Amino acid sequence: MKDQIIQKLHDVVRASRELVTLSDEAINRLLLDLADQIPNHQTAILEANQRDIERMDSANPMVDRLLLNEARLQAIAADIRNVASLPTPLDAVLEKRTLPNGLELKKVSVPMGVIGIIYEARPNVTFDVFALCLKSGNATVLKGGSDAMYSNIAIVELIHSVLQQHGINPDTLYLLPAEREAAAVMLGAVGYIDMIIPRGSQKLIDFVRDNSRVPVIETGAGIVHTYFDVSGDLELGKQVIFNAKTRRPSVCNALDTLVIHRDRLGDLSYLVEPLQSRQVELFVDDAAYQELHGFYPKALLHQAKPEHFGTEFLSLKMSVKTVANLDEALEHIATYSSRHSEAIIATDAATVATFMKRVDAAVVYANTSTAFTDGAQFGLGAEIGISTQKLHARGPMALREMTTYKWLIVGNGQVRPA
């Protein structure tokens, strides 16, 4: 298997060099055509997706991530059209100067080359990644999870068909075999893959970071907090907490821990009351338990263990932590945060400013839901993931983050003195 994969990676590198010659207009035409063709291939994609769904335990919270339906395919097509409508990130002059010796220097944005993505049960990522990589002039190597194998195969078949219709080398997109051995080859593919982005659980991200010889950008895992301050607006907090927890509980920007000022414990039952309608399980500290006992459904209320405050639930579960003041809230968040998205509900401007300055995360919110951590919501188009590291990219990784740069230098015979 290794030799076959390496040969295919040779082909991908060759295709990436061809992409440099494509105009933005040609790329946009292909992306729009792909979006238009999704409805025509909807039946095949959904049938393949159903095969994947049937292989997964229905109680697994990953089912929602795996699921495709007509509405989600329409949303995917809309995201692809949006990517096509965005300005190209390539050939932008980032910096320019003329040296005293007359040399003209320009720093311009260019493709990374070949970008590898390792991801779990998220077949929509296959579309998103291809659109972003093509728009930014990059070839793509995908290693999807075995849970989404049939869905990914059907999607890649459609993309390859559209590439061929537009006269573009289909090796621009390569879907690795589902076997584990393929991931090991990918992680060691120095000289073939320029950057690898893992999308999925913390376990997956840790594995890729610890085992890859190719540069890695960490994305994904979100242990997300919302702090309800002593000055927090009750109605605003109620709707924000409900949205952040229940809109799509299986995604990385969903709320995991509500941190509440002890002087507002009397309002806790009101803040979490709407969560009952979605059967949200609460894992709460002693102070919160005393407040909620007898109000929140007994079957859904549990006393928290230490591990509940460091868990990305990805389901209808949430922990609650009581703190004495802002400093204690900040300390709790610093201890358990994955540096993804954090929020405060407060009306005191000084408190908000302190929180937003001191919290170390890719995205920090005041008085709104963490569900907005998303490339499309930021006006960036679809994103490859949410980077939780600080080098190269942080937050939603969209088109600009899919490029690097090079220096172009023009002279008229200058030589450097000895």
Swiss-Prot record:
It is found in: Cytoplasm. Gene3D superfamilies: Aldehyde Dehydrogenase, Chain A, domain 1, Aldehyde Dehydrogenase, Chain A, domain 2. InterPro entries: Ald_DH/histidinol_DH, Ald_DH_C, Ald_DH_N, G-glutamylP_reductase_CS, Glu-5-SA_DH, GPR_dom. One of its GO terms (molecular function) is NADP binding. PROSITE patterns: PROA. Keywords: Amino-acid biosynthesis, Cytoplasm, NADP, Oxidoreductase, Proline biosynthesis. The keyword NADP applies. Signal peptide: none annotated. One of its GO terms (biological process) is L-proline biosynthetic process. It comes from the Bacteria. Its EC number is 1.2.1.41. It is an enzyme of class 1 (oxidoreductase). SUPFAM superfamilies: ALDH-like. The keyword Oxidoreductase applies. It catalyses: L-glutamate 5-semialdehyde + phosphate + NADP(+) = L-glutamyl 5-phosphate + NADPH + H(+). GO terms for cellular component: cytoplasm. Its main location: cytoplasm. Pathway: Amino-acid biosynthesis; L-proline biosynthesis; L-glutamate 5-semialdehyde from L-glutamate: step 2/2. Belongs to the gamma-glutamyl phosphate reductase family. HAMAP family: ProA. Catalyzes the NADPH-dependent reduction of L-glutamate 5-phosphate into L-glutamate 5-semialdehyde and phosphate. The product spontaneously undergoes cyclization to form 1-pyrroline-5-carboxylate. This is Gamma-glutamyl phosphate reductase. It comes from Chlorobium chlorochromatii (strain CaD3). The gene is proA.
